A protein has these predicted regions:
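Polytopic transmembrane helical bundles with strong interfacial aromatic enrichment
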Residues: 1-155
Length: 155
């Protein structure tokens, strides 16, 4: 159950950011939009790391319990698990790039903003575009990982 809640937490945060927060800030004046998006980004990072930790812990626990019970299915199950772990790993790498590569640059650029910002600075906009691309990739990979997880429960 914890595994499912953690998946919903991470994917829900991604979907909220893409469907609600991202489009909503476009209606705001640039400085407020930038600060709102940056605050949302740091919140999503926190929620995502909590979910990733829960997914790792509960996934390992589930695997150990299954192994100790001697109910490890065959080769097809192993292939499904490998595919799911590959997708999960890719999502964690993407999230790490967002947090450790783009996040600090965006935070620094936001902190350097003048009092009045008539438009998005190109340097900041460029960073956000890269950040959002990784978020969209994770939004595509996440449901596939969930479907693989469901397939694992059927075997």
């Amino acid at each position: 159950m914890i595994h499912l809640i953690a998946q919903a937490l991470w994917l829900g945060g991604i979907v909220f950011f893409l469907v609600v927060l991202g489009p909503a800030v476009q209606e705001l004046e640039p400085k407020l939009a930038i600060k709102t998006l940056d605050r949302g980004r740091t919140g999503l990072e926190t929620v995502s790391w909590i979910a990733i930790g829960l997914l790792l812990a509960s996934g390992i626990f589930n695997l150990v319990v299954r192994a100790q019970a001697g109910t490890m299915p065959g080769e097809a199950w192993g292939i499904l698990l490998g595919a799911k772990l590959l997708l999960f790993s890719a999502m964690v790498v993407h999230h790490s790039l967002q947090v450790f590569k783009y996040g600090p640059v965006m935070s620094r650029l936001v902190a350097q903003l003048p009092r009045s910002v008539p438009a998005w600075p190109e340097s900041l906009l460029s960073q956000w575009r890269r950040w959002f691309l990784l978020l969209k990739i994770n939004a595509a990979l996440g449901p596939i990982a969930v479907l693989l997880g469901l397939a694992l429960t059927k075997n």
